């Protein structure tokens, strides 16, 4: 009779261990899904940036911009929500964020 109780105790421990493992697996799955979503977003942004770069390379701008006016290409990239400063170049700006390094580069 004591052996049956031991089996039940062991089954209870196994059940607890499996529940803990299942919780850990669910957490790992959520982290993986978030990483995959972020990866897909970053790949799309990278593709758009590469397309833009290809457009700029095709167009050979022969006009020189005056020194007192910022580079219109950098302004356009900045207005589309990307950093143009050397510290965070091509990283997406957060909603409503304004980077002092970018602004200094554009308007010095």
From Swiss-Prot:
GO terms for biological process: DNA replication. Transmembrane segments: none annotated. Binds 1 zinc ion per subunit. Its cofactor is Zn(2+). It comes from the Bacteria. GO terms for cellular component: nucleoid. Zn(2+) binds at residues 83, 85, 99, 102. It is found in: Cytoplasm, Nucleoid. Keywords: Cytoplasm, DNA replication, DNA replication inhibitor, Metal-binding, Zinc. Its main location: cytoplasm. It holds the Pfam family YabA. NCBIfam families: PRK13169.1-3. Belongs to the YabA family. Homotetramer. Interacts with both DnaA and DnaN, acting as a bridge between these two proteins. Involved in control of chromosome replication initiation. Inhibits the cooperative binding of DnaA to the oriC region, thus negatively regulating initiation of chromosome replication. Inhibits the ability of DnaA-ATP to form a helix on DNA; does not disassemble preformed DnaA-DNA helices. Decreases the residence time of DnaA on the chromosome at its binding sites (oriC, replication forks and promoter-binding sites). Tethers DnaA to the replication machinery via the DNA polymerase beta sliding clamp subunit (dnaN). This is Replication initiation control protein YabA.
């Amino acid at each position: 009779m004591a052996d049956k109780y031991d089996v039940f105790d062991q089954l209870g421990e196994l059940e607890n261990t499996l529940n803990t493992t299942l919780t850990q697996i669910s957490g790992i799955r959520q982290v993986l899904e978030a990483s995959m979503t972020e990866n897909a977003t970053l790949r799309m942004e990278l593709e758009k940036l590469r397309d833009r770069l290809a457009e700029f390379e095709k167009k050979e701008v022969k006009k020189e911009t005056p020194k007192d006016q910022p580079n219109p290409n950098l302004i356009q990239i900045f207005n589309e929500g990307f950093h143009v400063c050397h510290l965070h170049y091509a990283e997406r700006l957060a909603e409503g964020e304004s980077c002092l390094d970018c602004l200094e580069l554009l308007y010095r």
